[in-house]
Amino acid sequence: QDTQKELKAAGFSTELQKATVAAIRKLVAKLDWSRSASEWNDYQKTSTYTDAEREIKAAFVAKALQGKEARLVFDLGGNDGTYSRVAANHADYVVCADGDDLVLDGLYRSLRQEGNRQILPAYLDLSDPSPGLGWRGRERAAFFDRGRPDAVLALALLHHLAITGNVPLAELVDWLAAIGGRLVVEFVDPTDPMADRLLANKPPGMHGDYRREVFERLLEARFDVVDRQEFPSGTRTLYHATPRR
């Protein structure tokens, strides 16, 4: 109350407050950005996928999700939201999580322009996700404690976490199982150009366990594999799997 009296005495009336807010709103509305480059902002153009393979991937995601009620889908490493949009046709809400803020900003802007509130772009370093914060870590829940997805997309993701992030395949599969929900996951073979580029920066033999047969064995130990689709290139495989109860 003392503060209100002081503001009133200084001539800071309700009309002045409204005018100040209007001026700030006008200033913020004028703010814009100059698109710059980031590691992944042109991934759809620079990746090694052919148009046919992109269509195969979109069709596989749609098939895995269609006809099954999904309240929430996590698209992990979702980049520009290409497959989040596919998932949104079969789900109430999709969280597109990625570690490239420029890519996510572009997605946010396009969604806002469309009036699309079904997809949420969320910045997240998957190798170091947001923990629980505040008093005893309970005031703001950790990212993966904020919702249990009915389905998870992990497309063109694991090779980055395994090779660049040095996370063992067994840990990655356990992590995906712990998140819960149906899984659509892509394994990129070490002979694939994108994986080979990452391995070129590592000592020979450092990621000897990063092989498709090892991944499939680990996946089948924690999930029931419903469907799989190998790309024409032979270096990438998609899997639709459900967690074992």
Regions found by a protein language model. Give the residues of each.
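A conserved beta-strand element that flanks and buttresses the S-adenosyl-L-methionine
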Residues: 153
